[in-house]
Amino acid sequence: MDKADTSAAPVGASSPIPIPIDQPQRSNSQQGSIGNGSGSHRTPGHIPTHRQSFAENLRNPPPSPRAQRHLSLSQSAIQELLLKNPSSKQPNPLFANRDWRDVAVGELVTQDDVKWADLDTSVEEATMLLLRSSPANVVHVREKSTDNTPVSTFDYNDLNAYILVVVGLAHPEDDEQVALYDEIARKARERVAIPLRDIQPICRKEVLVTFSADEPLSRGVEVLGSGIHRVFVTTGNGDVIGVLSQLKVLGFFWEEGVSFPEIDRLYPVPLRDLKLGTHQIIAINADRPLAEALTLMSNEGLTSVAVVDNGMNVVGNISTADVRLLTSAASMPLLESTCMHFISVILTERGVERGQDSFPVFYVNPYSTLAHTVAKLTATQSHRMWVVESPSPSPSVPGTPLLQPVSSASSGQVAGATPTTPATTSTASGTPALSTATSTGSTIVIPSAVPTASLPPPVSSSVPAAALPGAHLSGRLTGVISLTDILNMFARSSGLHPSDPGEQRARRRRSSSASMRPSMEASRPSAEFIRRLG
């Protein structure tokens, strides 16, 4: 956004990310992702020793938030947040009477967002930099320390991919990469420093786009509204001086929208009338193992996934940024715990950091205004909001979800229309099953093709969905609205021509399942992509 003792989920690690012990040899992806087909699967083993985490090295363990708990965002606070529309503010003199399309991208960025690592920097060191990079959530990777031009990046998606390789849940597409994956896991197990250079082939790389600081914001919004998550802003000689991210641009439009009538007039409009978002979503049942959610995000090229109960009601959100809680050996049992349990760990960790509980605010409904949606996105620093309807009152779905396994679907994709033929996959027992509609409507659950039978039982009981703050305030999942969707609409409503975001989404999915080239060329912008935006 997304109970165990907080010591089970420390933030960071002083060793090169958690390592399972006694791992069998890895084989290619034809033998399954999480299942134990032909000995290829390696579940996290017993960790005999515990090395201090990043957090333990940086600060003394804080007192437990259990002693005094209160919601950080009460209903009144949420209402106040949503009523604080910048449209009621006086225009900022810096942007008054200006066309937002003529604002220079350099006016929105700061040098503080730029964190550097070299290709020879260890994954451990890069992870520490990443944990400190908020709100940019990215580390720039350069060839050598004297360079000021990135050749790659390191973000939470890459950290997730690395952890999946280390614990044996990621599988290469060909025999050539089998040796690479095994070598990375071996070095991590032996606590040998692994340079970022070595993990480039396993990381899914987005196109690297750079703009000069004097480029107009219209160009930046066209690119970001086409599905690119960030743009590097450079000086005339090519040195990076800032990062223009989707979230930064949306925050700018939220704070300064009163100066731009084309943007400000859209805020009072309901999402239903704007026809924003998509009904094709990927969700996972709350009772499924966390390892399955992480694998699902990696395979599908996602930064977050909705967590739902048996009635398809949204009960939480897990993002790749949450893997920061898995960067120590002691946190490995969390991979075997349920998604619902991990959500409770996320909320507890936020309580430790802030001294109070967090109230999950990660959903909107079709009648929410754009202002309501953007307020939540900027306040929570989220990349998407789940669109929900009223909570499912179906007699077949208890008011307090029991979170028992669903025989027809463990994790899956919510599609916008019922397929003409039933989708076949495997249940938790490994036998074929047909996906069935969760209601009489058109939304169905398509089970994941990722088998989960080999994962051990959760190490602790799942926290009931009804026990979490806000559990009764969400509703049935029907869609999703992303930063890309909103920026794409802003661009089109202002006469710009962004590319179809679906192209970038498809590219991320392809690059997640295909063998990655071990070179920097895969991450450099293609001439064709730049021409389409020009």
UniProtKB/Swiss-Prot annotation:
Domain of life: Eukaryota
Protein family (similarity comment): Belongs to the SDS23 family.
Keyword Repeat appears in the UniProt entry: yes
Region (Disordered): 1-71, 389-438, 494-534
Skewed-composition ranges (Low complexity): 406-438, 512-524
PROSITE patterns tied to this protein: CBS
Name of the protein: Protein SDS23
Biological processes annotated in GO: cellular response to glucose starvation; regulation of mitotic metaphase/anaphase transition
Role played: Involved in DNA replication and cell separation.
Keywords: CBS domain, Cytoplasm, Nucleus, Repeat
Gene Ontology terms for molecular function: protein serine/threonine phosphatase inhibitor activity
Gene3D superfamilies associated with the record: CBS-domain
Localization: Cytoplasm; Nucleus
UniProt-listed SUPFAM superfamilies: CBS-domain pair
Residue intervals of the CBS domain: 109-173, 203-262, 277-334
Gene this chain is encoded by: SDS23
Family matches, as InterPro entries: AMPK_gamma/SDS23_families, CBS_dom, CBS_dom_sf, Ssd23
Cellular compartments per GO CC: cytoplasm; nucleus
